[in-house]
Regions:
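Non-catalytic DNA-recognition/assembly elements of restriction-modification systems
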Residues: 1-21, 145-208, 219, 228
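DNA target-recognition domains and sequence-specific DNA-contacting regions of bacterial/archaeal
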Residues: 6-144, 198-259
Length: 259
């Protein structure tokens, strides 16, 4: 039986950019923005560097990019590369979320990844074009429906298990691609000519319809492909859609099927 969910501010269930002590010059694990993979929970790489500044975090914290286009691309991760009590650091362009007492850290991570947080965060962005940043106070004051801790834990566990399965499947796919490459070399050798890409394919580019115009994204039927959706080999559906008005009033382009 589903319990009653309580409406709370996000700042009531998570600490934002919690204070941590890390002396300058201390060698620690650094997670640069380039180390995060779009729509990927785990942090695949880090560097050991002397701390000179940046956001600080511990295992279990969620780090979310607050700058465009990294946030739109899905750069949000759950820290799992540190030892007990160890502090890591990273880009100043992260927002760090730490689950408060009585809040499940996996539930918080998947909440931050959801449209419940992402969409208002993206809409709150301010700044010059190409360097827009999330207004942290807007995110802190979002109203969130929060279940009991038991339900949080159940939700977090289910989604964590699915993520674990995705990770296993990704490793299987990497192995299959490696086998395909080995088989290709065995069949055709390495005597492949290098020619300019433009000699065999036509390339084009476009631009993103302004996020300030909600009407571009309403009553929409045209698939809008974001960079995070280029991770697979095929695109069958997209998270967002745009309409003909967006095409007419921006540099976005419609590409033919099988592009």
């Amino acid at each position: 039986m589903k319990s009653e969910w309580t409406i709370k501010k996000l700042s009531e269930i998570a600490d934002f950019n919690p204070r941590e002590s890390l002396r300058k010059g201390t060698v620690a694990k650094k997670v640069g923005m380039d180390k995060l993979q779009p729509s990927c929970r785990d942090i695949p790489f880090y560097e050991l560097e002397a701390y000179t500044g940046g956001t600080k975090f511990r295992n279990g914290d969620t780090i979310m990019a607050r700058i465009t286009p990294c946030l739109e691309n899905g750069k949000t991760a759950k820290v799992n590369i540190l030892e007990e009590g160890e502090i890591g650091f990273g880009s100043t362009e992260y927002i760090v979320f730490r689950a408060k007492e009585g809040v499940d850290e996996d539930f918080l991570y998947y909440l931050v990844c959801s449209s419940i947080i992402r969409e208002p965060a993206i809409k709150s962005m301010v700044g010059s074009s190409g360097r827009q940043r999330v207004q942290t106070d807007v995110v802190e004051n979002l109203d969130i429906a929060v279940p009991s801790y038991e339900e949080q834990h159940l939700i977090g566990r289910i989604l964590r298990n699915l993520d674990d399965k995705i990770k296993i499947n990704s490793k299987i796919n990497e192995n299959l691609l490696h086998q395909l490459h080995v088989l290709y070399l065995r069949l055709f050798g390495d005597s492949v000519m290098d020619i300019p890409l433009g000699d065999v394919v036509a390339t084009t580019s476009g631009g993103t319809p302004s996020r300030k115009h909600d009407e571009y994204y309403s009553d929409s039927s045209i698939c809008w492909v974001k960079s995070k959706e280029l991770l697979g080999n095929y695109i069958h559906e997209t998270e967002e859609h745009i309409n003909n008005l967006a095409i007419k009033q921006s540099s976005a382009k419609i590409l033919p099927e099988h592009s």
